[in-house]
Amino acid sequence: MKKLVSIAALLLIIASFSLFIYRPAKETIIFFPIHPHVTFSEAKTTLQLQPQKRDGKYSLLWSAASSLDRDAYLRQDISLLFADGRLVDRLAKWKTNSQTLTQEKIVAARDSRFFQAISFHHGELHEGEMITSSQTMTSDYLYVIDSPYSPLVSFHRAATQDEKEWQNVLNKTTAEFLQHTSESLLSHFSIQKQQYYSLYLPDLIVYNEQPLPDLSMEKTQEIIGKLWEGLYKSYFLGIKKEDGSILSPIGSTTPLILISKDYSHLLVLTETKDGEKIRLTQQISR
């Protein structure tokens, strides 16, 4: 009997230890120093309008895929889809000991809209005791015209006069909405915008290929990697308020990214579907 109790106790200790060291991959993206020789051989995000409408709604095929040039200890991809300045949906996938991830989703919508998707592709690499990472971003956008006066159509770049007019209308509507929301957020939190480099999350894609002002590409990638680490934890999985409660990000405004010009910190501002103003703060290591 004593022997059985001892074995049970030992198993409990082992189980407890296993729980302690286990890191749930789906709940974390962690930035590690960028591996200088590991790259993504392929990465893409795509938005495609499907030909048939159903119950008055059209469908978008939204996909995100990436392939690293070697197996990674942990592969993770996340993607965010915005329409007219608000978050519509999320995609996420992770896999251990893998190179490639592919995911897609059909999203139903109605009315004419401007869709923007941005994805973060990440690989965590273990070589002995050294842990490094590889990362990249991809994006896509799509204008969908759903009008009772014309056939359902979509385009990336306007080719006809009608498409150009619709593109201007949708761009203006989205820009004015985000400008109004941003001004309200900046005023609410008493933030001096001139002290920051500012951009909306989908525009972060430009820093795939160029550094932030007065920074090296290496430091830029570190800031971007840690920004996505924070976004995944505190926005993608649920907006974490100061009181500890969690709100769904669906319906929230496109995050405004504010990077302090002295590179001491960055802010992420958004407004939830219910109108609650949110500020996320992240310190930048020197």
Q: Which residues are covered by each model-predicted region?
A:
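Gram-positive cell-envelope targeting signals
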Residues: 1-49
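Short beta-strand elements
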Residues: 128-166
